[in-house]
Design a protein with these regions (language model features):
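Phosphate-binding loop that captures ATP/GTP phosphates
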Residues: 1-52
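Conserved beta-strand segments of the P-loop GTPase G domain that flank and frequently precede/overlap
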Residues: 55-56, 88-90, 111-117, 143-148
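P-loop/Walker A phosphate-binding loop and immediately adjacent motor/lid segment at beta-alpha junctions
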Residues: 67-73, 126-152, 187-190
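Well-ordered beta-strand positions
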Residues: 86, 110, 164-167
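Inter-motif core of Ras-like GTPase G domains
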Residues: 98-118
Length: 210
């Protein structure tokens, strides 16, 4: 979880669902990242034996720990790939100043690029697409997805901006409720979420082969 401005952990799950809260900042503050340091600071999700997370804690920010460099970010990602079969980095949209997100985008085997159907997303893409088209970001490995599509929104308009779109993720009221309740990792059980679940399963097959 790369976001150091708005740490995602508080809206992903309840504190009681985490075995022990540890901080990403403790890893990146080290002069060199080691496998043992990563394992020591992983947070295990009690409701899924196959999921562990690394991220900033509630109340922490970019100034809580000493600044880190590209080397620490690269070491973290390389070692994480040796520890776990799949490593997902939740990148921020501010790749110009977020070192971890920038390194993750460059080193990733596959990048899933999400865009909404609103004017803010269009403004962001107009500003940032020239940066993302640079050869160092390897546009060929970027899968494009239009996300949180509501009935009144035209995803086809976003395709005109993005080019070919691999996935179209519909809005789910159940997911929105989980976000508001801080339970985004919870199971989805409502009928209205079926289309959402199918698209997530499609992404899982395409990216991870599972």
């Amino acid at each position: 979880l790369a976001d150091m401005i708005t740490p995602p952990l508080p809206y992903l799950c309840a504190p009681s669902d985490i075995e022990q809260e540890r901080s990403l900042g403790s890893i990146l503050a080290a002069s060199h990242v080691t496998e043992n340091l990563i394992k020591k600071n992983c947070m295990f999700y009690r409701k899924n034996d196959y999921l562990s997370m690394v991220g900033m804690l509630k109340g922490e920010n970019v100034f809580t720990y000493p600044p880190y460099e590209k080397e620490q970010a690269a070491e973290l990602l390389q070692l994480a790939a040796q520890i776990a079969p799949y490593v997902i980095v939740d990148c921020t949209s501010n790749i110009a100043s977020d070192i971890l997100s920038a390194v993750a985008l460059m080193e990733a085997d596959t990048v899933l690029r999400l865009a909404g159907c609103d004017l803010k997303s269009i403004s962001y893409l107009s500003s940032q697409l020239p940066l993302l088209s640079d050869h160092k970001w390897d546009a060929d490995k970027q899968l494009k997805a239009v996300s949180n599509i509501r009935q009144q929104e035209a995803s086809s308009h976003m395709e005109q901006i993005l080019g070919s779109v691999s996935f179209q993720i519909p809005h789910s009221s159940e997911v929105e409720a989980q976000f508001l309740e801080g339970e985004l990792l919870g199971e989805l059980g409502l009928k209205e979420s079926r289309t959402f679940r199918r698209e997530i399963e499609k992404i899982s097959r395409e990216v991870f082969g599972v």
